[in-house]
């Protein structure tokens, strides 16, 4: 079968190669054909810059090779080059784009809530098995919740001695009704853990993450001659519930499977155009702690507040008072957020209730700052109750849900810098942006273990139509963001960049 374009090189050729899809078809003087590397390995290389440095290759070939012999030796001896590796990866990604887009649309149309990712995990497991990975399903144990199944998936591909690298994705979706109008939009409705019927949507891009992981898994399975070590593909459930990473670790993730030297992940973002990636060394995302506070009083008739102790008034003062924690007690060099997201109290206009319940979220980078905020919340609640004459038997109840706590995400600076250089080489310097940290949270941080024993890095993947982002910046009207019913990444450039960047990162960490 004829190849798209064939270049024939004389023995003395040292010049540029035309860009585009090529296969090198070398002929001996007698006319006997030397089959191309495309024929040998089923690959067609894309040469974007169009220059083949035979001088560099000659230095790695046996002494005395001519230009032609050097080229042939390098093609058939498996000598890798950065340009050759990139050309191979580019061609493979382009070949797989139709399949990746189909996978993404299927996942987007069939989201599953946290703790219920049964079909999604089974799909990922099946895809990894088909690629030759050794797959273990149902990894994850949720302490105190025997009714939740562990839907974590671990796929291992061993390739000789070398580092162990984990690539992680999330599996779950959100209770959001999709309003994108896409032809593959989710129409799923189901019951959540509380038994309420809700709509479900991949409103945080985990479908992009899953597809990128599967694409990366395929690229690396086909490029095994260019890396060595143990590659682990990790599909984590219940990220949105901040419980899946801990569940997998509690189920022996690092004892049942090889302990990683590095763990890497990506996350789509509305802050960048599709085709770009972002890196954030050091603190990248905040810790998250949910707090419930019950302010108690003495109920009574709304017409006679003087004989009651009004917890609604307590709550009003408390909400205002805690605004001073960040502004007056926290150092401006230690970012923190205290947000009251829910207040519930009372049933009728003429009844003073016995209690008011508040729900808060705390976000910090440093653990000592988090502990100080928790102490300040207790102190202020007690002080306001005392000022209202609340008896000690009705003191406020302040409860921090440590089971719902997620530590701050700290990207190992050295690993992040290394990946940043890889991305600049693969995507171009203009397509790699250093992003500031944010106060959002997620549980990827747990894979580093305590005291940051394992270097981890989560980088950001641009997912927005460049023109829409430019218009947003001109007009000041934000594009739909994560967790929005309108969140709709641009699939093709986002997936192309996700697979290329993640595969290149692994190849660098596991290079021979």
What spans do the regions from the language model cover?
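N-terminal secretory signal peptides that target proteins for export/translocation
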Residues: 1-60
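Bacterial N-terminal signal peptides
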Residues: 65-78
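Sec/Tat signal peptide C-region and signal peptidase I cleavage site
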Residues: 79-84
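Metal-dependent amide/peptide-bond hydrolase catalytic core
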Residues: 85, 316-512
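Sec/Tat-exported extracytoplasmic proteins
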Residues: 93-100, 104, 108-111, 115, ...
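Divalent metal-coordination and catalytic microenvironments
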Residues: 107, 167, 206, 233, ...
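Histidine/acidic-residue-rich, glycine-tolerant segments that coordinate divalent metal ions
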Residues: 152-153, 189-201, 207-208, 220-342, ...
């Amino acid at each position: 079968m004829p190849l798209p374009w064939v270049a024939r090189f004389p023995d003395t050729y040292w010049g540029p190669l035309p860009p585009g899809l090529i296969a090198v078809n070398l002929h001996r003087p007698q006319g006997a054909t030397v089959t191309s590397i495309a024929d040998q390995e089923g690959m067609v290389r894309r040469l974007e810059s169009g220059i083949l440095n035979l001088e560099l290759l000659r230095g790695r070939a046996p002494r005395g090779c001519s230009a032609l012999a050097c080229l042939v030796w390098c093609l058939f001896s498996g000598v890798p080059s950065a340009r050759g590796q990139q050309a191979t990866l580019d061609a493979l990604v382009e070949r797989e784009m139709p399949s990746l887009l189909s996978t993404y649309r299927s996942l987007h149309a069939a989201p599953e809530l946290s703790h219920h990712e049964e079909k999604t995990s089974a799909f990922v497991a099946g895809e990894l098995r088909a690629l030759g990975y050794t797959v273990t399903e149902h990894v994850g144990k949720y302490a105190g919740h025997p009714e939740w199944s562990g839907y974590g998936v671990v796929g291992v591909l061993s390739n000789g001695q070398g580092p162990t690298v984990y690539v992680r994705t999330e599996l779950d979706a959100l209770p959001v009704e999709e309003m994108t109008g896409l032809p593959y939009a989710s129409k799923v409705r189901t019951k959540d853990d509380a038994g309420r019927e809700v709509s479900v949507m991949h409103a945080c891009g985990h479908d992009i993450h899953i597809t990128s992981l599967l694409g990366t898994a395929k690229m690396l399975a086909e490029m095994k001659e260019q890396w060595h070590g143990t590659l682990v593909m990790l599909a984590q459930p219940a990220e949105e519930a901040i419980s899946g990473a801990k569940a997998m670790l509690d189920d022996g993730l690092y004892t049942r499977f090889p302990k990683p030297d590095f763990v890497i992940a990506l996350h789509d973002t509305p802050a960048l155009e599709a085709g770009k990636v972002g890196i954030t060394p050091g603190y990248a995302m905040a810790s998250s702690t949910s707090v419930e506070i019950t302010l108690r009083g003495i109920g009574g008739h709304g017409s006679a507040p003087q004989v009651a102790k009004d917890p609604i008034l307590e709550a009003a003062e408390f909400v205002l008072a805690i605004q001073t924690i960040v502004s007056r007690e926290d150092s401006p060099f230690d970012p923190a957020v205290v947000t009251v997201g829910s207040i519930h109290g009372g049933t009728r206009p003429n009844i003073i209730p016995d209690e008011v319940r508040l729900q808060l979220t705390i976000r910090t980078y440093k653990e000592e700052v988090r502990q100080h905020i928790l102490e300040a919340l207790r102190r202020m609640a007690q002080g306001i109750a005392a000022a209202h004459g609340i008896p000690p038997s009705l003191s406020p109840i302040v409860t921090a849900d440590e089971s719902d706590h997620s530590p701050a995400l700290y990207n190992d600076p050295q690993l992040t810098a290394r990946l940043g250089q890889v991305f600049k080489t693969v995507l171009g310097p203009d397509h790699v942006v250093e992003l500031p940290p944010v106060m959002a949270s997620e549980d990827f941080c747990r894979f580093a273990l305590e005291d940051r024993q394992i270097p981890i890095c989560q980088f950001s993947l641009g997912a927005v139509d460049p023109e829409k982002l430019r218009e947003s910046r001109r007009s000041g009207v934000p594009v739909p963001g994560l967790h929005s019913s309108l969140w709709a990444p641009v699939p093709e450039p986002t997936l192309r960049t996700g697979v290329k960047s993640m595969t290149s990162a692994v190849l660098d960490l596991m290079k021979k």
